[in-house]
Amino acid sequence: MTQDQTAEQMPAAESADQSADQGPAAESAAPPAVDSERIKELEAEIAKLKNDVLYAKAETENTRRRLEQQAEDRGRYAISNIAKDVLSVADNLRRALDSVPASAREGNESLTALTTGVEMTERELLATFERYGIKLVAAQGERFDPNLHQAMMEMEDPSQIEGTVVLVMQAGYTLHDRLLRPALVGVAKGGPKSGGNNVDTKV
């Protein structure tokens, strides 16, 4: 073999050696086959975890709002028990005024002064009630409302629409949007009928 032929064969041999060396490396660089079923399982698990996180967030927010509402209610209605006790004071003032007819006041300065003082006390007490969210329940002349009124009797009155409150025996009160005490009332019957609530006169 001549020197030139030997030189021509050497690059070919080196190229073959390099290909042989790169063969295993090229094969190891290829990405492993991934199980498509496993991918689906992982995707399902991720979706479930996302839903669980969203649910937990919603529950946390609902709990926070509920606690805030409870705290607000405790503040708004903390005086409920005291208010119910004080209502009897307003009742007694009203009874005292109702027991003195206007005719008895005429010509009696002492009695007039006394009733005027009681009226002022009543107005001041009701104004104090208002400041704390305690309000009188509208009753006289109103349509009977079982949510606000308690019917104690029915009164024959053809001139009034049936179910109209024609007598207030005891005032009712609300505290903000809650009923402290229903108004005890008498309601008309025998007059024109109007669609609405049926009146239950049972105590």
Swiss-Prot record:
InterPro entries: GrpE, GrpE_coiled_coil, GrpE_head. Coiled coil: none annotated. Keywords: Chaperone, Cytoplasm, Stress response. One of its GO terms (cellular component) is cytoplasm. Its main location: cytoplasm. One of its GO terms (biological process) is protein folding. Disulfide bonds: none annotated. Residues 1-38 are annotated as: Disordered. One of its GO terms (molecular function) is protein-folding chaperone binding. CDD domains: GrpE. It comes from the Bacteria. The keyword Cytoplasm applies. It is found in: Cytoplasm. Participates actively in the response to hyperosmotic and heat shock by preventing the aggregation of stress-denatured proteins, in association with DnaK and GrpE. It is the nucleotide exchange factor for DnaK and may function as a thermosensor. Unfolded proteins bind initially to DnaJ; upon interaction with the DnaJ-bound protein, DnaK hydrolyzes its bound ATP, resulting in the formation of a stable complex. GrpE releases ADP from DnaK; ATP binding to DnaK triggers the release of the substrate protein, thus completing the reaction cycle. Homodimer. NCBIfam families: PRK14140.1, PRK14141.1. Belongs to the GrpE family. PANTHER family: GRPE PROTEIN, GRPE PROTEIN HOMOLOG, MITOCHONDRIAL. This is Protein GrpE. It comes from Paramagnetospirillum magneticum (strain ATCC 700264 / AMB-1). The lineage of its organism: Bacteria, Pseudomonadati, Pseudomonadota, Alphaproteobacteria, Rhodospirillales.
